[in-house]
Regions:
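Membrane-embedded alpha-helical bundles that constitute the cytochrome b-like, heme-associated redox core
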Residues: 1-210
Length: 210
């Protein structure tokens, strides 16, 4: 029996959508508190920046643990055959090559920003600890600042690209799926091979060649 192309299939579980939007809000607040003062908008940005940074670190840690132990981490790995399939125009399983690349590059940038940001907390007075600007020598602090700034610029650029592509008419099904969790079989079939990703994890025990 033919499958109904208008039938809804699940793309994102509720917990994944919550993680995405918490991360998105944290990134937007971090970008605002980092770059708005540079262009002349003055406000007390340090508390907002470090508190939001801690929230982002917790969210990232949750994602790493969840992906490693409760999800199929390998479905996001990029293998040589994925490059060959993309070049040949072959449809992907659950995640396309551009989606995997975005996840990998953005994830790396967020990890660098989080790690360097955690070190920079030594220079911030909080209710939990007193600042210690002498934790590292001047040269090492310079490296930390450069890495943090480069990661922030990368995150800003990738976020703008992510928002742009999510608003394109042909990609809007992904945005709706990130909001409501579902897309139609017809929408999924535009970029995904139904034989490799059906929208039902029970039917895709190995993400079917992902």
């Amino acid at each position: 029996m033919a499958l109904d192309p208008k039938a809804l299939i699940t793309r994102h579980a509720p917990i994944d959508r919550v993680f995405h939007w918490v991360t998105a809000l944290a990134v937007l607040l971090l970008m605002a508190s980092a770059f708005l003062p540079i262009v002349g908008l003055e406000f007390s940005w340090v508390p907002l920046h470090w508190i939001t940074g801690v929230v982002l670190c917790i969210a990232v840690l949750f994602h790493v643990v969840q992906s490693t132990f409760f999800r199929r981490l390998k479905c996001m790995l990029i293998r040589p055959r994925h490059l060959r399939e993309f070049a040949a125009g072959k449809k992907a399983a659950k995640y396309t090559l551009p989606q995997k690349l975005m996840h990998a590059v953005l994830g790396f940038a967020v990890l660098v920003a989080s790690a360097t940001g955690a070190i920079m907390l030594a220079k911030v007075d909080t209710p939990l600890w007193q600042r210690n600007p002498y934790l590292l020598d001047a040269a090492t602090w310079g490296v930390v600042y450069v890495l943090h700034g480069a990661a922030a610029l990368a995150i800003l650029t990738l976020t703008m690209a992510h928002v742009y592509f999510s608003l394109l008419p042909e990609k809007r099904a992904y945005l709706r799926a990130m909001i409501g969790g579902q897309m139609t079989r017809e929408e999924a079939a535009q970029f995904h091979d139904p034989a490799r990703w059906s929208g039902n994890r029970k039917d895709d025990p190995k993400e079917n060649g992902q």
